[in-house]
């Protein structure tokens, strides 16, 4: 079994153990490895435009807001935008700040026919540290 297969199997087992309805749950490091090893895999960043502009972007990511900024309203066109930009047959990974919005996006994608939908745990900024701040522990930025 190669590194890609091992990584996906681990993510799939993690999803089964957590009773998640999508294909798998990846750590940020695992997601990076998948992007390098899986031709055609896509990363969908579901943070807001403000987060992309002020916190940082992931190169080559598909950017679709889950919650619209300003106003923090749900993006009623999320699924239509996803279908326009990402083939339901490819492996797709969802990323947000902490892993919560991306979990919701992966749920919706899986329910809508994306059989290879994965959530990226910890998100872009990682978990909160002892002082309640992000960007110090884990996350995509530190993978």
What do these predicted regions represent?
Residues 1-40, 49-91, 102-143:
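Rhodanese-like catalytic fold shared by cysteine-dependent sulfurtransferases
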Residues 43-45:
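Structural scaffold elements adjacent to functional motifs in cytosolic proteins
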Residues 94-95:
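Short, surface-exposed ligand- or partner-binding patches at beta-edge/loop junctions that are enriched
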């Amino acid at each position: 079994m190669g590194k890609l297969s091992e990584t996906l199997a681990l993510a799939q087992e993690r999803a089964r153990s957590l009773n998640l309805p999508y294909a798998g749950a990846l750590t940020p490091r695992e997601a990076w490895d998948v992007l390098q090893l899986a031709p055609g895999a896509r990363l969908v960043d579901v943070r807001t435009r403000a987060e992309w502009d002020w916190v940082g972007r992931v190169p080559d990511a598909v950017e679709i807001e889950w919650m619209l900024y300003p106003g923090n309203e749900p993006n009623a066109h999320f699924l239509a935008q996803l279908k326009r930009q990402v083939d339901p047959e490819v492996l797709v990974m969802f990323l947000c700040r902490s892993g919560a919005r991306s979990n919701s996006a992966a749920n919706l994608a899986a329910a809508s026919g994306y059989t290879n939908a994965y959530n990226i745990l910890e998100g872009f900024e990682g978990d909160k540290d002892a002082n309640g701040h992000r960007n110090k522990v884990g996350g995509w930025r530190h993978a």
